[in-house]
Amino acid sequence: MGMYGERLGRGVTREAARKYETSVTERARRERWQASGCARVVSRKYGTVVVPHGSNFAALLNAAEVWGCDWTEIRDEEVWRADKEERPVPMPHLI
């Protein structure tokens, strides 16, 4: 049994907490981009893009990342199954 408050984050530096949070976010992003399915996201404003598809929400997140917009701007856009010959765009590199 550990010390009291150990699970509450006491004794953890802000830098360590930020690093942990970043690693979780980056891991989720990589898993989203490694999905086996493909979807075509169609937007009136941004056009069409083929992205990896684990779910419709994941496809919207990937499309928003490609287009450089917030996913809430495109949450009402259409997500369609991509044809077998279509390939998804590569994962963008974030700076």
Can you say where each PLM-predicted feature lies in the sequence?
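N-terminal intrinsically disordered, low-complexity tails
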Residues: V12-R29
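Residue-level detector of alpha-helical secondary structure
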Residues: E21, Q34, L61-A64
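A short, charged, amphipathic alpha-helix used as a generic interaction element across diverse proteins
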Residues: G54-T72
